[in-house]
């Protein structure tokens, strides 16, 4: 569900009951409700920089949800995260995010100036840098600026742990950074090396696992991150119990259920995977709490995609066609993916003329996107699926 560069909800001291309530909304994808609570908490605690981080976090993730950028497909495949389309938050969202980030920096830096070994302040500013790194990449597509903030985030997280080794929650940043850089291609990894981040994929995973078991406030964040990492590492069996626990804790979060379906599909458990998708569709039809935000056509794409991987092309096509027909109404990433997958499915059935029409819809939807380029390539040359023996 989460991109690996995303920053999680850190706080070294136990969260107040009010903030805990805000994060219950947050993890249930109810970002407007979470934001309202965080802002009230900020009014009651105006000197706390972490609350400004919570506000920025909710604003960013709300924009990511609307853009279809929270699914773990961001971290599957060959650095698919680096190919994501640029997000376009509103001017109000951008201003609110910038204001929260500025306040977080100002308050944390004042404490660090007074006491450089203030672990809580170092932790807070590490999160602020990380949030801005995420924003620089997803919204501005400013890779170098993002890398600078990414590096600063790690540096301050290390200072927090050095000042207080008991800050287990803060270690998630170190593990996240190690895993991300350790997973990058050599060209990107070179930039990380020059910035002082060498990367350690296995070590990063171990650190995140430690936080999931021993963290104070970040256990849920670590579990979410581990589920995405395990899928990327082709260890989906490890992710299933994590997601089942998250679904029980946050039943209104439809993404956890959709991710579970994908994990089950990875494991070859076709019936369970399809049943999980169908259960989400049923909740959406009944307008169950939390399921009014997901469109039926997005669910159709995900089901069609699962059927594609199970070689059930005849069953996949109507689901994918439903998503393609709604390509202008669903999020851009899903719309593009649906056009591409429908074309590929038709190609595998030797219906290339129909496939070309699907590919052309993808090209027209976002001509400069990476997926549009892929669509154009298959329009010119029929898609052939590589089999792993």
Indicate where each model-derived feature is located.
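Residue signature of alpha-solenoid helical repeat architecture, marking inter-repeat boundaries
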Residues: 12, 46-47, 51-53, 116, ...
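"A position-specific structural signal for the A-helix of alpha-solenoid helical repeats
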Residues: 20, 54, 61, 124, ...
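Amphipathic alpha-helical segments of tetratricopeptide repeats
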Residues: 43, 155, 162, 212-213, ...
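Structural signature of alpha-solenoid helical repeat scaffolds
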Residues: 43, 113, 145, 162, ...
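TPR alpha-solenoid repeat register
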Residues: 51, 121, 170, 221-222, ...
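Alpha-helical linker/edge segments of TPR/alpha-solenoid repeat scaffolds
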Residues: 62-89, 139, 181-189, 235-238, ...
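Terminal, low-structured helical/coil segments at or just beyond the last alpha-helical repeat
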Residues: 213, 217, 299, 348, ...
């Amino acid at each position: 569900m989460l991109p690996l560069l995303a920053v999680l909800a850190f706080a070294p001291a136990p969260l107040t009951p009010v903030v805990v309530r805000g994060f219950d909304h947050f993890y249930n994808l109810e970002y407007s409700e979470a934001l309202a609570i965080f802002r009230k908490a900020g009014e009651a605690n105006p000197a706390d920089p972490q609350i400004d981080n919570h506000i920025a976090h909710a604003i960013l993730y709300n924009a990511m949800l609307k853009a279809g950028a929270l699914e773990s497909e961001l971290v599957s495949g060959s650095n698919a995260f680096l190919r994501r389309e640029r997000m376009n938050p509103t001017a109000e969202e951008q201003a609110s995010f910038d204001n929260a980030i500025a306040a977080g920096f100002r308050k944390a830096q004042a404490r660090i100036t007074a006491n450089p070994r203030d672990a809580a302040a170092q932790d807070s500013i590490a999160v602020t840098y990380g949030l801005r790194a995420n924003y620089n990449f997803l919204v501005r597509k400013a890779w170098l600026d993002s890398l600078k903030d990414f590096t600063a985030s790690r540096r301050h997280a290390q200072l927090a742990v050095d000042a207080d080794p008991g800050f287990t929650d803060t270690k998630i940043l170190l593990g996240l950074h190690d895993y991300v850089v350790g997973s990058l291609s050599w060209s990107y990894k070179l930039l990380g090396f020059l910035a002082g981040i060498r990367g350690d994929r296995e070590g990063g995973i171990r650190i995140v696992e430690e936080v999931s078991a021993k963290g104070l406030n970040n256990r849920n964040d670590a579990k979410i991150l581990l589920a995405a990492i395990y899928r990327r590492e082709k260890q989906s069996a490890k992710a299933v119990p994590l997601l089942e626990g998250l679904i029980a804790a946050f039943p209104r979060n439809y993404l956890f259920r959709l991710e579970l379906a994908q994990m089950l599909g990875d494991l070859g458990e076709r019936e369970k995977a399809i049943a999980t998708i169908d259960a989400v569709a049923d909740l959406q039809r009944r307008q169950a709490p939390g399921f009014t935000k997901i469109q039926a056509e997005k669910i159709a794409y995900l089901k069609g995609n699962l059927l594609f991987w199970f070689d059930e092309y005849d069953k996949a096509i109507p689901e994918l066609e439903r998503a393609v027909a709604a390509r202008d109404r669903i999020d851009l990433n899903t719309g593009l993916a649906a056009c591409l997958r429908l074309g590929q499915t038709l190609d595998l059935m030797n219906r290339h003329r129909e496939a070309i029409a699907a590919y052309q819809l993808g090209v027209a939807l976002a001509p400069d996107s990476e997926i549009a380029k892929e669509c154009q390539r298959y329009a010119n040359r029929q898609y052939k699926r590589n089999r792993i023996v």
